[in-house]
Amino acid sequence: MDPKKIARINELAKKKKTEGLTAEEKVEQAKLREEYIEGYRRSVRHHIEGIKIVDEDGNDVTPEKLRQVQREKGLHGRSLDDPES
């Protein structure tokens, strides 16, 4: 997210505590917060989808649900053509 938008979120939060927000500012704050949260969720999802879990012996123990997502996206050499990947 653009640093200017984050600064605006913080500015509105501070103003809300000190003097309150107008109706327009409340709408703007909600919109900015939703945009921030969506970006955060996207980032976390991308990070988790890129994880490959291995045990002490080097065996891939990635949960099947995550493996399926990785197959769909072609991550870690996984492929929909090879269900064992």
Swiss-Prot record:
Cellular component GO terms, alphabetical: cytoplasm
Compositionally biased tracts (Basic and acidic residues): 62-85
Keywords, sorted A to Z: Cytoplasm
Family: Belongs to the UPF0291 family.
Name recorded for this polypeptide: UPF0291 protein SSA_1878
Location of the protein in the cell: Cytoplasm
Stretch list, region Disordered: 58-85
Main localization, broad class: cytoplasm
Organism taxonomic ancestry: Bacteria, Bacillati, Bacillota, Bacilli, Lactobacillales
